[in-house]
């Protein structure tokens, strides 16, 4: 069910500005593309938003575990995305191979790859398109790339663990949040100097965006389930601190005749929340979506918001006038970032150099429910992603105790006494009582009721226990599973 309040403020469509460049509306067409960064399959999924169909994937590497070979030369952990203001270049950040790959959007062809420091996270072009800033989260700097030369030109020193950069549409300031330190840096773009350091309400910011009117900066705080809002102009004061929910992931904006809105993906409870922007941001809709929503981006006219499901193997289109999901599209595995690029393909079909989804489309989706009275609202989504002979299982839990370790087991039954237990993983929760863990192994038995499972193997189940007291079961798998 969608909970919403009445939309009372009307804004003429002709005056609308859209993120990220603050431009006037560009109607949705078959020239546009939606791109999703698929971290496990090491692909970029390519969607035509005119009909909400998957066109194929750009393969940048092999799936895990093949990508872990010492002789492997492809990209690893495809994660972050950015696009040039002229829509001609897609920048793809691969965390594991320390790289950013530039792709021609009209042909889906790789133009080249630039290698940077340890564990880069996200990429963003300056509004004039002359520079590409990469946050090198595994170190302490932003790598400034000349996209024409495909070469690093300079580094901007930051606090340890810069998470993401966003620019105001006027190009004067860049804003860099941190994933390891409670600090947001304001950078003068022309001089590449930090002009202000602002306090973050908590250390882990994975995502940041500037409003298309260039008046506010919004950041997500994944560790505490909040969104922090600042002024985008001096003195850059804090304007709001919003309680949003566990595993608050990404944020973006859409303007339409109903008003100006911010959309936030809340991974722990599988919703997108819409806030009316203003002096006191107001929650106006809570939109149920697929498992572990992550990346989010508006269409060029703000009529839709696209969101990727990290544990769902799909992306969804949301109508921003009704705040209802109008389409779901299959994509690759454990998707992180998503971007919408208007007029990415000015001419032709734009399907060159694409491959079918293939094995990456073979996944199952499970649910864990509370198994006792200690945490009655606890739950988790689980994806079982086929990697061929092996599988990657990702568990995203919420509603547990904060900053605690739990044991994950495979069992013979999902009911007491659960039968034989085999240890699978350790789940660590953050300050908000939420946590995500991944494990690789021959785990299709978790989805024995679905097409991904071997027919000769009985189904096994997942339970989560208190690490200090293994008899305390906090989560157990329900019987049902869904498959793609």
PLM features: what roles do these ranges have?
Residues 412-457:
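Extended, polar beta-sheet/loop recognition surfaces of beta-rich domains
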Residues 470-484:
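Short beta-strand elements
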Residues 2-14:
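Bacterial N-terminal signal peptides
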Residues 454-469:
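Internal, hydrophobic beta-strand segments that form the core of beta-sheet-rich folds
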Residues 389-395:
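Structural beta-strand segments of beta-rich domains
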Residues 397-400:
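Short, flexible loop/turn segments at beta-strand junctions in immunoglobulin-like
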Residues 404-410:
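Short beta-strand segments enriched for Tyr within beta-sheet-rich domains
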Residues 13-378, 388, 402, 419-423, ...:
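Predominantly soluble domains enriched in secretory-pathway, periplasmic, or organellar proteins
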